[in-house]
Amino acid sequence: MSQTQTPNRRLDLLGFFCPVPVHETRKALNEMQEGELLEVHADDPETLQDIQALCVRIGVQLLSITEESGEYRFLIRK
């Protein structure tokens, strides 16, 4: 990860299920400044759709989604 892609904040939402990951992601983004990066870790498969929908709904940029061993990593720019 390059320096420009280093997250300003990380959320560990492993073990949480809907609606907690979306709620906590929205809450974190509301507390962040424009242009900052948020990294979210989750393992609820519903987050694949829910986080993408949240990003579209609130107008933030979903930079990447990666999956490894059932854990998802979302990188979001506010």
Q: Which positions does each model-derived feature cover?
A:
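N-terminal pre-ligand scaffold of iron-sulfur
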Residues: 1-2, 36
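Right-handed parallel beta-helix/beta-solenoid
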Residues: 2-12
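Amphipathic, hydrophobic secondary-structure cores in small proteins
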Residues: 13-66
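Core SAM-dependent methyltransferase catalytic element
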Residues: 73-78
